[in-house]
Amino acid sequence: MRLSLKSPFVAALACLVSWSAAAQGTQREEIVRIPAAGGAMMVATVLRPPGEGKRPLAIINHGSPVDSAQRLKMERPHYPSLSSWFIARGYVVVLPERRGYGETGGAWAEDYGSCRSPDYFGAGLQGAADIKATIDHMRGQAYVAPDRTIVIGQSAGGWATVALSSLNPPAVPGMINFAGGRGGHQKLSGGGMGNCEPDALVKAAGRYGSTARVPMLWLYAENDSFFEPKLARRMVDAYDAAGGSATLKALGPFGSDGHNMAGSSSGVPMWSGPVAEFLTSLK
């Protein structure tokens, strides 16, 4: 099959190649420790674009393994394509590993309790506290511009990002939630697998929205096995109805599970347009 240079597939492939090239041999990587609540020290990866001077900050926040035994075995998060996309646009990218995960270790701060009565609201705020600690620490670095930070999160990290929006941290003009939520892929008391208590997610989203004033972009794929489109719509409707300002982009299916879109290079053509448009809209 011959592909025209005007083909959308070829154009998307060209973009992917340029993002990969931008990341190779030019970005600088450093592992740092960031003070967090309770005396914890979070391990974080810092990726810097070439050149000197102060750059805007992008914080990318990871998800959580379904199997609790895997939390402390987690490798440091990478999100290479997502990171490269922001680095190519001049951002310093930071990927913190929150309390209770991987090399950071310690007690799991985001424990939401039992599946029958989950505290998704409190769990999200614990994750938000770690993101806020990352913002505060990184803004003190000589190479970071303290007046512009974009917060991005996927799955549990997306949920923590939604929670952070309720705190309205200064100089954060926008936040991006990829497939955010908690309690997915759990064994249900009535049998089968699913979300522990979807109504609790919707209620917590509304509570966050009641104080949130920072613009948000929510991205969910059609075949997300953790948080299906109807649930995503219910959450964003509750968030906005309570006073929040979120735009939901319901994207098409991605691979075998749309929940993995943010972590795959193949997902870039799906989300890059909405993300670029969102960033352009911010003051």
Q: What residue spans do the PLM features occupy?
A:
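Short substrate-entry loop that stabilizes the transition state in hydrolases
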Residues: 53-55, 64-105, 228
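Alpha/beta-hydrolase fold nucleophile elbow
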Residues: 143-154
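Alpha/beta-hydrolase active-site loop
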Residues: 113-142
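Short glycine-enriched nucleophile-adjacent loop
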Residues: 158-169
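The feature captures the conserved acid-bearing segment of alpha/beta-hydrolase catalytic domains
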Residues: 174, 180-242
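N-terminal cap/lid segment of alpha/beta-hydrolase-fold proteins
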Residues: 24-53
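The conserved beta1-alpha1 loop
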Residues: 61-63, 220
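C-terminal catalytic histidine-bearing segment of alpha/beta-hydrolase fold enzymes
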Residues: 233, 242-283
